[in-house]
């Protein structure tokens, strides 16, 4: 647990903090550098599935570049709201309110905030993000799996996200967001794998509120 806390203490800027929160794909997919000629229907299927998520709650396991894992619960509500509630003992909370992502570190009483669109998660959360425009399909070797890499060439500083969808009749659009890989501008990779998906559940907007740990004079 001390190693987990040390990892968060070393976060020196929002991009690094964000890279801790978002990503995952299978090793076979990550190891394939070739970009396939994307079939519009496949990209459309994945985007339709993504946009079809109204609310989602799922367990996650996050793995950083050193192989250390942290678990927690993800809650998502469109448009643009997300919450990463980390396991007990991790003094960090990440919340998106539809416009910005906020990282709250309760141990050091610090808050960092940046626009959703300026991060790899923009592809997931920003309702104005044209995912299909910036998406490339990566080969998976499995017709039941779609891998989309999203990167804005005009803004490489926003990073790259690779989303993995698997065929699941119970998911919106018949494709389930299984995992994703987020790569920041410093090429730091984090992986996030989801499980126990619950779609269409009632999610109160209060879920995306948070308690400010900073002294009143510093807010």
Predicted regions and their residues:
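Sec/Tat signal peptide C-region and signal peptidase I cleavage site
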Residues: 29-38
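Extreme N-terminal tail/first-helix region
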Residues: 37-49
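An acidic-aromatic
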Residues: 73-125, 190
């Amino acid at each position: 647990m001390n190693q987990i806390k040390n990892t968060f203490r070393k976060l020196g800027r929002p991009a690094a903090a964000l890279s801790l929160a978002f990503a995952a794909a299978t090793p076979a997919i990550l190891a394939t550098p070739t970009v396939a000629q994307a079939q519009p229907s496949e990209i459309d299927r994945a985007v339709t599935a993504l946009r079809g998520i109204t609310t989602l709650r799922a367990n996650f396991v996050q793995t950083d570049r050193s192989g250390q894992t942290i678990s927690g619960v993800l809650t998502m509500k469109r448009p643009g709201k997300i919450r990463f509630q980390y396991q007990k003992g991790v003094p960090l909370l990440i919340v998106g309110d539809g416009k910005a992502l906020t990282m709250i570190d309760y141990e050091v009483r610090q808050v960092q905030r940046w626009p959703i669109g300026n991060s790899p998660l923009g592809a997931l959360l920003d309702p104005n993000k044209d995912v299909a425009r910036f998406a490339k399909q990566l080969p998976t070797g499995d017709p039941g799996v779609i891998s989309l890499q999203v990167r804005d060439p005009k803004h490489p500083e926003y990073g790259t996200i690779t989303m993995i969808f698997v065929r699941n009749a119970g998911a919106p659009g018949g494709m389930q967001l299984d995992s994703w890989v987020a790569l920041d501008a410093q090429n730091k990779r984090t992986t996030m794998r989801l499980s126990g998906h619950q779609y269409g559940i009632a999610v109160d907007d209060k879920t995306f509120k948070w308690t400010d740990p900073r002294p009143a004079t510093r807010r």
